[in-house]
Structure formats: structure tokens, C-alpha cells
Regions:
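Bacterial Sec-dependent N-terminal signal peptides
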Residues: 1-22
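Short S/T/G/P-rich N-terminal loop/turn motif that feeds into the first structured element of a domain
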Residues: 19-106, 110, 114-257
Length: 257
């Protein structure tokens, strides 16, 4: 499974562009239905694979949010985060009959009765879903892990506190991520702006970042960390934002163009 995930993630550098739109679904699963939820996503995995082949969307990823069972704040977090990527607004708003597509995918592979039962299960496994639509503003170049090296996924939501925030991310913090990437610590960083959200979603978050770090690598210290100018940039950059969402995740399913 690990090798399969790594082979999939290698394609990120080719499949992700600056102009991409991404929908986030933060999902809370009904108690006792975790295995059913995984079964549902396994069904959808083949459907999404076909959707990507049919140019309905660019990518689909399901992440499981890691939680500390002894931490009350962690227990409030979603159980899963699903990401659907699109080339542009035209692709995102393309009308799709998902049931017809699923029937096409499973024709000859699953009986009609079994298909209907699986299809009807989809809405029952979710207790709550909160949605965001974001636009990719910037990212680093993909730095593939070594064979067998695992990856750690960190998903952060920030509230911009002043008009300088986006510049700090793209003109200062990005350089930091690039240096960590060149040093072999980091595989990927992306910066996304919230365009819209559901009414039940967090109303404070304005931007999201995704950091993908390589496991079992030494900590990286910026070469300018002792300089006063660098320290002031860090201080003011941090002051331009407030982190309101912070999740560490494990990738469960993924398909890319």
C-alpha cells in the first residue's frame, strides 16, 4: 500500500497547476460506521478514477485526520478530509450524473441489487460535512521521496490579519519552504485562498496551506535565522496570520490525471 501511495504521489508535480480550484470536504463519520465509510470511499475510488479519465475533474484524495483520543480539541476535528481538484471553473461546474457514471463503472462487476445497496449507503455514513472551495495561489516544486520513504501531511487553515499576509506567504515563507525542499526535508508546500464555504464551515479561515514533509529527516534551520532582518520578517510574517485549523493527516485514497 505504501509503495502504491508513493507512486501515485510522484505525479503531483505534473498534475497540479497554479490556477487549480480545489474543493475540501471536512467529514464527520457517524459513530460505529467507520468501516462502512471506508467501503463507500472504496466504491467511489473507481468512480473518481473514471471521472478523471473523462476530464470531469483533475484529482481526488481522501485523507484520514490523525487524532489524540486523550485530547478534547482533537476529538472535535473531522474524521476525514476529501479533496477534489479541478483545472478551472468550467470543469468544476460541468454537470455530471454521478449515479450513471458509477453504473457504467460497475457494469458487469457488481449486481444491480448490490450496486443499489452500496449507492444508498453513501449519504448514511456521514454525520456532518463542511465544505470549502479554494484557489491555488502558489506552490513549491515537487521533491519526490526516496523509495520506501514515508511522508507526513500537515493541513493548516489561517485567518489573514492584515493585507500583507499573502505576500509574506508567497515572498518570504515560500523561500523558506524551498530551502527546506532543497535540503531534502520537505516534499511539497502549497498555498490556497478560500473563495467560498458552506454555512456550517469555519467562518474565520481565509487561506489554507499543505506541507508534505519527508519522514525520518533531520530538522532544518534557515541559514539566515541568526540575522536581525530575518527574525523581523519571521515576527511580522507570523503576526500577519492566525492559525485556526491544524491537522496532521494520512492519505487513504488518491487518483490523479
Amino acid at each position: 500500500m505504501k509503495k502504491q501511495i508513493l507512486s501515485i504521489i510522484f505525479t503531483l508535480t505534473f498534475s497540479i497547476s497554479f490556477s487549480q480550484l480545489i474543493s475540501y470536504e471536512a467529514i464527520w463519520v457517524n459513530e460505529g460506521m467507520e468501516e462502512d465509510y471506508i467501503s463507500v470511499e472504496e466504491i467511489w475510488s473507481e468512480v473518481k478514477k473514471q471521472a478523471i479519465a473523462d476530464d470531469i475533474q483533475d484529482f481526488w484524495i481522501v485523507f484520514k485526520v490523525q487524532k489524540d483520543a486523550t485530547n478534547a480539541d482533537d476529538l472535535k476535528k473531522p474524521d476525514y478530509i476529501v479533496m477534489n481538484g479541478f483545472k478551472d471553473e468550467e470543469q468544476r461546474t460541468k454537470q455530471t450524473n454521478w449515479k450513471e457514471l458509477a453504473q457504467k463503472v460497475y457494469k458487469g462487476k457488481m449486481s444491480k441489487k448490490k450496486f443499489e445497496k452500496a449507492w444508498e449507503m453513501t449519504p448514511t455514513v456521514r454525520k456532518e460535512t463542511r465544505n470549502f472551495l479554494v484557489e491555488r495561489l502558489d506552490n513549491t516544486v515537487w521533491n519526490a521521496p526516496d523509495e520506501g520513504q514515508s511522508l507526513n501531511f500537515f493541513f493548516n487553515g489561517f485567518q489573514a490579519l492584515n493585507d500583507d499576509y499573502e505576500n509574506y506567504e508567497m515572498k518570504f515563507f515560500k523561500d523558506w519552504h524551498e530551502k527546506r525542499t532543497n535540503a531534502g526535508k520537505q516534499a511539497w508546500w502549497e498555498f490556497n485562498k478560500v473563495l467560498s464555504r458552506s454555512k456550517n464551515a469555519n467562518q474565520d479561515v481565509t487561506h489554507f496551506t499543505m506541507d508534505i514533509l519527508k519522514a525520518d529527516t533531520p530538522n532544518y534551520e534557515h541559514p539566515d535565522s541568526s540575522l536581525f532582518t530575518h527574525q523581523m520578517l519571521v515576527k511580522n510574517g507570523v503576526a500577519s496570520r492566525k492559525r485556526v485549523i491544524g491537522d496532521e493527516m494520512t492519505m487513504m485514497f488518491a487518483h490523479f490525471e
